[in-house]
């Protein structure tokens, strides 16, 4: 991570920039410099290209010059890949953490905890819309209930995380921000994600590092396998035994914070 590079973080879905402050053992002060673009689909409607262009313009306005380091967590990897192809040689490197691969690249859904959401988005936009409305209602009025529903089948070290009050409180706020107040963004971006984007991977010319928890049942290891085969400039893959989705993010952010501390 170059001292001169600007860092851009793409959160998961549901998610927000609050992910950077989720973990008590990762000092947020070492991460606070990261730029988290606003992912607002209200003006781009169902146009994925316009949506990605709007995010790219935010980054260019924030960082007119200098190399850029992209970090994509979970479904944020989908956005990071697209932005990398638009920013081109401005991007110095990419870290994909618990990355969601294109669904058309494998039989992943049967291994994914959130399969019902993606199946609805693929097969029935109407049903998906109803599902998002229910999630939005629950996030605003009963965030703890929604948290328990989403984290009912956690695996690996995510089980320990999900049992901690600090993580529960942080995720409840994230769910309210993402689903309660910005459900339209969540709905639009998942619709973009399931529409097929595997061809974008071959356009990524920057070095990529994959961070994959081997116990992840949100974005299973098979997704990292597919990305490894498709990305032309994969420079490293970090397989983390016993870690699942958010525990892999915690591990990555901890390493990033330690590296930032060494450079300070």
How would you label these PLM feature ranges?
Residues 2-45:
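Conserved HGGG/HGGXW glycine-rich cap/lid loop of the alpha/beta-hydrolase fold
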Residues 35-68:
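Active-site loop/oxyanion-hole signature of alpha/beta-hydrolase fold enzymes
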Residues 218, 237-254:
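Catalytic histidine-centered segment of alpha/beta-hydrolase-like enzymes
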Residues 114, 135-199:
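Alpha/beta-hydrolase
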Residues 94-135:
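Flexible "cap/lid" loop of the alpha/beta hydrolase fold
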Residues 204, 210-212, 216:
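Short beta-strand/loop motif that positions the catalytic acidic residue
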Residues 71-76, 80:
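Gly/Ala-rich beta-loop-alpha elbow adjacent to hydrolase catalytic centers
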Residues 17-18, 217-223:
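Conserved alpha/beta-hydrolase "acid-adjacent" motif
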């Amino acid at each position: 991570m170059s001292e001169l590079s600007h860092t851009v973080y793409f959160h998961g879905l549901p998610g927000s920039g609050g992910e950077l402050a989720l973990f008590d053992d990762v000092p947020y002060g070492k991460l606070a410099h990261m730029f988290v673009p606003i992912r607002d689909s209200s003006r781009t409607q169902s146009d994925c290209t316009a949506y990605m262009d709007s995010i790219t313009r935010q980054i260019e306005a924030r960082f007119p010059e200098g190399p850029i380091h992209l970090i994509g967590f979970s479904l944020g990897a989908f956005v990071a890949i697209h932005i990398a192809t638009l920013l081109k040689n401005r991007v110095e490197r990419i870290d994909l953490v618990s990355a969601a691969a294109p669904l058309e690249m494998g039989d992943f859904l049967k291994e994914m905890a959130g399969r019902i959401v993606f199946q609805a988005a693929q097969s029935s936009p109407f049903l998906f819309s109803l599902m998002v409305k229910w999630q939005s209602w629950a996030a605003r009025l009963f965030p703890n209930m929604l948290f328990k529903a989403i984290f009912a089948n956690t695996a690996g070290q995510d089980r320990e995380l999900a049992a901690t009050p600090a993580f529960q409180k942080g995720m409840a706020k994230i769910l309210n921000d993402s689903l309660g107040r910005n459900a339209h963004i969540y709905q639009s971006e998942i619709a973009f994600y399931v529409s097929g984007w595997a061809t974008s991977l071959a356009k990524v010319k920057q070095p990529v590092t994959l961070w994959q928890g081997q116990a992840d049942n949100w974005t299973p290891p098979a997704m990292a396998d597919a990305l490894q085969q498709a990305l032309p400039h994969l420079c490293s893959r970090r397989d983390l035994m016993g870690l699942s989705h958010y525990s892999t993010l915690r591990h990555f952010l901890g390493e990033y914070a330690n590296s930032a501390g060494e450079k300070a």
